[in-house]
């Protein structure tokens, strides 16, 4: 199985097969999840100082902040041409 990567904005990529959820950052439970990840040094901020539009939860407990809308990231995940392949 080839490892696939997903562009989450500004040249940042994550491993596509390790994503559990892509959610909006607006709800209180997601805000709590982001704060807990920050406190446990498991937060990766890929926004380059811009507004967080999507929160990506990874299978290893890391939480990734992205400046791209969740719908756009999901579309990229479902669109095979948008994924980069290793090797």
Curated annotation (Swiss-Prot):
InterPro entries: RemA-like. Pfam families: RemA-like. Belongs to the RemA family. NCBIfam families: MtxBflmRegRemA, PRK04323.1. HAMAP family: RemA. This is Putative regulatory protein BCAH187_A3920. It comes from Bacillus cereus (strain AH187).
